[in-house]
């Protein structure tokens, strides 16, 4: 893997494209494929506000690359992964994408990080015919595509989507806990708006209305006003469209003023850092989730071996972000292998849309795509922090 810092000056080399059959009229690149390697790109937040996501995701991706390459690669081709630091800045994500497409000649962009950053940069990829595979955002724009816009066929998502997972989680919690005043605080960007959409859609379906709606700007650190408003509005269940520090920050402010609703986090809340940093403050917190978080001291079999390999390589405990990053690479490798020895962009798309399943080692729902569905799964879980660890409350949820 080569990690580069962003540079404003980007080369303007043309990208070689191969036109697909009239079936979709999608342009897809064949660049980045040689007899010995496949060049992949990613942009992560490695030094910005969500680096606690970006760094372990990239670690997991590198572990996957190492594993694939140690086994001889994909039909003899080793993966070369190029990573750029977007710092969770949409403008830097655009520059990173341009650089990787035009200079590094990436075959695909895999696991790019963040709703605002992915949204800002994805057209750079589509215009060049570069597939955007398994981004680290579960926003709807990462998998919903208009058949009349053939370049949108280049996007695939294997994350549990924010809208559908939020609906499933809210439905379960409302039916179980029967709160009287359901409320939400969400980040004012594409991620948060997707969570809000799922929240409102589910309440509408249940003939309910939100008792309080509050937002915050990305990067905010003071949540006293939001906590006070929700307490004033008598909220007894709060959905948080937050990430890590915002989750802990809001719950800390709530504790100061004696506000103790049922707390439910969207999927980005379901990470090890929440109980590690929040400690007793976050005991009892619920979160919507896609898979069981592996703990190195209690895992068994292939998951135990993976945890130990991660710890040996990076010297830190593995987490859910690392699992997702690892799965990005392994899912790509699975479908690139299916595409055959003479790999092309067209053959990769055909393999992805074949309906054939990929099953990871972590017991996640199977990944499967088709020509009309580029979303892997909508099966949801709810987990809770108990004694400092995430434990499963309910699985196999749909709305």
How would you label these PLM feature ranges?
Residues 115-126, 228, 236-257, 328:
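Hydrophobic alpha-helical
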Residues 28-62, 84-91, 113-114, 185-194, ...:
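Extracytoplasmic "Venus flytrap"
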Residues 26-28, 37-39, 52-59, 67-144, ...:
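Beta-alpha junction/loop-to-helix N-cap segments that form part of ligand/metal-binding clefts
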Residues 310-322, 333-392:
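Segments of small-molecule ligand-sensing domains
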Residues 105-212, 262-287:
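Extracytoplasmic ligand/sensor domains, especially the bilobed periplasmic-binding protein
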Residues 152, 251-326, 338, 396-399:
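Extracellular/periplasmic periplasmic-binding protein-like sensory domains
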Residues 93, 157-181, 222-224, 247, ...:
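Hydrophobic alpha-helical segments within soluble ligand-binding/sensing domains
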Residues 1-39, 397-399:
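Short, low-complexity disordered leader/linker segments with a strong preference
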């Amino acid at each position: 893997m080569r990690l580069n810092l962003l540079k404003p000056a980007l080369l303007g080399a043309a990208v070689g494209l191969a036109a697909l059959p009239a079936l979709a009229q999608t342009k897809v690149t064949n660049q980045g494929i040689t007899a010995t390697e496949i060049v992949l790109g990613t942009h992560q937040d490695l030094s910005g506000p969500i680096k606690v996501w970006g760094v372990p995701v990239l670690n997991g991706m590198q572990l996957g690359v190492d594993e694939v390459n140690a086994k001889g690669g994909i039909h003899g081709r080793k993966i070369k992964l190029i990573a750029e630091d977007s710092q969770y800045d949409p403008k830097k994500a655009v520059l990173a994408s341009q650089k990787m497409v035009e200079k590094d000649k990436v075959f695909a962009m895999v696991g790019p990080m963040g709703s605002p950053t992915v949204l800002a940069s994805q057209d750079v990829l589509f215009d060049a015919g570069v597939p955007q595979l398994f981004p680290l955002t579960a926003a709807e724009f990462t998998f919903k595509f208009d058949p009349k816009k053939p370049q949108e066929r280049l996007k695939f998502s294997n994350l549990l989507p924010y809208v559908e997972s939020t609906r499933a989680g809210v439905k379960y919690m409302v039916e179980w806990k029967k709160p009287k005043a359901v409320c939400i605080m969400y980040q004012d960007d594409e991620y948060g708006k997707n969570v809000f959409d799922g929240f409102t859609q589910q309440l509408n379906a249940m003939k309910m209305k939100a008792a309080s709606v509050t937002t915050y700007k990305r990067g905010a650190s003071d949540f006293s006003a939001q906590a006070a408003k929700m307490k004033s509005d008598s909220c007894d269940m709060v959905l948080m469209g937050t990430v890590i520090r915002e989750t802990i920050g809001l719950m800390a402010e709530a504790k100061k003023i004696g506000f103790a609703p049922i707390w439910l986090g969207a999927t980005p809340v379901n990470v090890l850092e929440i109980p590690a940093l929040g400690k007793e403050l976050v005991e009892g917190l619920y979160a919507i989730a896609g898979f069981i978080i592996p703990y190195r001291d209690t895992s068994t079999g292939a998951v135990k071996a993976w945890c130990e390999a991660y710890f040996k390589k990076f010297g830190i405990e593995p987490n859910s972000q690392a699992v997702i990053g690892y799965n990005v690479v392994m899912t790509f490798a699975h479908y690139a292998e299916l595409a055959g020895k003479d790999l092309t962009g067209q053959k990769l798309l055909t393999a992805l849309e074949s309906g054939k399943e990929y099953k990871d080692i972590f017991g996640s729902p199977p990944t499967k795509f088709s020509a009309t569905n580029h979303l892997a799964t909508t099966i949801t879980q709810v987990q809770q922090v108990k004694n400092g660890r995430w434990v499963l409350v309910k699985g196999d949820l749909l709305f």
